[in-house]
Amino acid sequence: MEPVLELEDVARSFPRGIVALRQVSLTVGAGEFVAVMGATGSGKSTLLHCAAGLDRPSSGSVRLAGREISRMRERPLTRWRRDRVGFVFQSYNLLSELTVRQNLALPGRLGGPRRRDIDEVLAAVGLGGTGRRPVGELSGGQRQRVAIARALVTGPSVIFADEPTGALDPTTGGQILGLLRRAVDRDGVTVLMVTHDPAAAAWSDRLVLLRAGTVATDAATPDASTIADRLHAVSTAVAR
């Protein structure tokens, strides 16, 4: 399996002696769905942000889609990432006053997706015919579908998802995870997802558990009950 994402000895520290990541190494292959879990403060979101180029590691290297990104300047990185990376966040990051179609067109204003591509991806996520509706009129589940569509419309190699179901009920959350799973299985997209929910993590192929900024577990994903037990064990070990 060809690597799409490679982190090597990545560390991230902040002022006042806060260390979020400690020499983390992680390789994610093409078409792989990886869930990242851990106790509060374990470094989950920092790992995702460093992997996506949204934050810079204090040391170590990050290769994304074959390119070393940890030392790229911000503007070239943003341009390079536009057609290769999609993002899905718990807060949706959509503009409520704009229509669904306008939100999907935003990531590619400098030569972005065609209208036909937008309509096709909206149909694929179950939002066919909603392109002219303002996002502010949609339910939470529909907004997250728009966010998934926006992530997919440029044909990315990787989707980074930070708690994509955190604000949704279990049924709607399952539908959103099904869309991510389909992107992996049908389109070969790589997904790196941070979640606190064992049921959400169970949709992945691989589970990475963080403990105090280090990788405690990296293995094939078990069932939700076993994930919950492992997460509890890691969290308890940190509390001691």
Q: What name fits each language-model region?
A:
Residues 159-162:
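Catalytic Walker B motif of ABC-type/P-loop ATPase nucleotide-binding domains
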Residues 134-138, 142-144:
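Conserved ABC ATPase signature
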Residues 153-157:
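A short, proline-enriched helix->beta-strand linker immediately N-terminal to the Walker B motif
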Residues 69-85, 225-228:
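ABC ATPase NBD coupling module
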Residues 52:
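Helix-to-loop junction immediately C-terminal to a conserved catalytic motif
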Residues 98-105:
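Short coil-to-helix segment of the ABC ATPase nucleotide-binding domain corresponding to the Q-loop/switch region
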Residues 127, 131, 151-152:
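ABC ATPase C-loop
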Residues 37-39:
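The feature captures the beta-strand-to-loop junction immediately N-terminal to the Walker
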